[in-house]
A protein has these predicted regions:
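Mid-core helix/loop region of P-loop NTP-binding domains shared across ATPases and GTPases
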Residues: 83-84, 99-142, 151-155, 193-197, ...
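C-terminal alpha-helical "lid" subdomain
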Residues: 156, 211, 218-322
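Conserved NTP-binding/hydrolysis module of P-loop NTPases
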Residues: 10-13, 72, 83-101
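A short, basic N-terminal segment
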Residues: 1-41, 290-298
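Conserved AAA+ ATPase "SRH/arginine-finger" region at the nucleotide-binding site
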Residues: 78, 184-196
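Walker A/P-loop nucleotide-binding motif
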Residues: 43-62
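Conserved AAA+ ATPase "sensor/coupling" helix adjacent to the nucleotide-binding pocket
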Residues: 93-95, 165-166, 174, 195-211
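Sensor-1/coupling segment of RecA-like P-loop NTPase cores
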Residues: 47, 51, 106-110, 135-142, ...
Length: 322
């Protein structure tokens, strides 16, 4: 929509995780290193935690991208609301492995046999579980018991658990004490500092083919950085909507005035935004609002070209819709 206007080749601020635009802060680097080292050394359990929108899923996808040519067999679970049996069936399905028996015990025993054979052949099997805070304690306990399978040197199944802060709190409960004791590494992805946030935005704009100074003024970027509180997903949402608004206004670069308007419209006074609902839900709403704004501006411009009578028709239509 606004790419050619701002001299961009790609959309710089997709809300969905995109490894192509990966920006690694020090805490992101540590999380990636924890996963990489833990899996390579066959340590067993690795945990990564962090707030909503800080880039946990992006790190997982980048890890998979880096390792796609290595002898890894990966199972990526993005819906963690599973019973232990459902999790086992998911593992079997993703490994293209025929389910043995109907009982959980039979499935675990057959899976052990499979893992031992893979280990003998020099292959590593990795289970990646995103949104681990949604997994029940029963399933996590069973997973901890199952992961005890090992050779004389290594764990047979490498398990990476990625979740929000509530998952970290759950690990500190008595019930999941056994699981916590099995963790070989636990990394926390932190929010970006203001300096890192500015660097993040400029990095993405450059990677999209643009000159940051010709797309946003520095005060405009700083305003967005302050509002985002260091959460990359919020940075993306606000910047994308600022670009949409700037495009409709034919304003280049995007000014602080436009970013203030975007923040006020989508975040500043709205309790909806302040409650910090998951932005996976919020983003489509913002997109809809942006499109609505675009259509309204387009209609008004068209009406101005046609004359006063058409402008009056649009005002009547809007009054009916309110």
């Amino acid at each position: 929509m606004y790419l050619s206007f701002y001299g961009l080749r790609k959309q710089p601020f997709h809300v969905t995780p995109d490894p192509e635009f990966l920006y690694l802060s020090p805490s992101h680097e540590k999380a990636l290193a924890a996963i990489t080292h833990g899996v390579e050394e066959r340590k067993g359990f690795i945990a990564v935690t962090g707030d909503v929108g800080v880039g946990k899923t992006t790190i997982l996808r980048w890890y998979l991208h880096l390792k796609k040519r290595e002898p890894l067999k990966t199972v990526y679970v993005f819906n963690a609301r599973l019973t232990f049996e459902q999790l086992l069936r998911t593992i079997y399905r993703e490994l293209d492995f025929r389910i043995a028996g109907n009982s959980v015990t039979e499935m675990v025993e057959r899976l052990y046999e499979f893992l031992i054979e893979e280990s003998r052949q020099g292959n590593t099997v990795v289970l990646l579980i995103d949104e681990a805070q949604n997994m029940s304690d029963d399933t996590l306990e069973s997973l901890a018991m199952m992961s005890k399978g090992e050779t004389s040197k290594d764990k047979l199944l490498q398990i990476v658990l990625v979740g929000q802060p509530e998952f970290k709190r759950a690990l500190n409960t008595d019930r999941l004490r056994q699981l916590k004791q099995q963790l070989a590494a636990h990394a926390t992805i932190r929010r970006l500092s203001r300096g890192e946030s500015l660097e993040y935005l400029r990095f993405r704009l450059k990677h999209a083919g643009g000159d940051p100074t010709s797309v946003f003024t520095t005060p405009a970027l700083k305003k967005i950085v302050r509002k985002s509180k260091g959460i990359p997903r919020v940075l993306n949402v606000l910047c994308d909507n600022a670009l949409i608004t700037g495009f409709y206004r034919r304003q280049k670069p995007v000014t602080e005035r436009i970013t203030k308007e975007v923040i006020r419209t989508y975040g500043g006074r709205s309790s909806f935004f302040r409650r910090q609902l998951p932005l996976a839900v919020l983003a489509p709403v913002l997109f809809f609002l942006g499109i609505t704004s675009f259509l309204r501006v387009k209609r008004m411009r068209s009406a101005e070209q046609r004359g006063p009578g058409h402008r009056e028709e649009i005002k009547q239509d809007e009054a009916i819709g309110e």
